[in-house]
Amino acid sequence: SIINLSELNKGLVLVTGPAGSGKSTTLACIIDAINRTKEKHIITLEDPLEFLHRHKKSIVSQREISSDTESYVVALRASLRQSPDVILLGEMRDFETISIAMTAAETGHLVLSTLHTQGAANTIDRIIDVFPPSQQRQIAVQLSSVLQAVVSQQLIPGTDGESLIPAFEMMTATPAIRNMIRENKIPQIDGTIYSSAAPNMFSMDTSLQKLYQAGKISADAALAHASNPEMLKRKL
């Protein structure tokens, strides 16, 4: 269901998690799926460039922020003049970058980016909190209309003692979720994800439970990375 995000034509998709959790790999997989299946103009803005994409069905222009341009804001503004369909933004570091990214998503581009947050509710709070208080209401309304999905991920030590297994949470912006963002009921989002039975909406703890049941991670590892260890312990 995460790869299915490549089917989107517009809006904002965020992949979040701590440093070294594999966010760049997840985004590269989504970009590659678009590149293989659609005729699009894709621009990637990264610091540093981690994955090189060859042209397949799409045209992919890759810019390294440190060597090709002076900042994400400058690079993002320049990229919008080149008629991209898809923009991969390595990181959203400040409110100016976030603001331009949201406007790009609003005007018909698919914008993919990352944040160092864990969980959808924390991510949404973080974006809104970056802005001055006087703008936060307007940003919440804008975010509620442009956000398509938030994927959170972490890498869990595998039972073989060597591998690291990715575990994911996925929030899809349903009408109910959009309403929660708009009405500042963000704390309710985690509960909605937790209780969802939809294939494109699942909690981190559901992922951990499935990985444990498949024998890929230990119970201790699952509980150490859980959002709600007490509840997960009962399920294991």
Residue spans of the language-model regions?
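Short, flexible helix-loop junctions that flank or precede catalytic/ligand sites
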Residues: 1-236
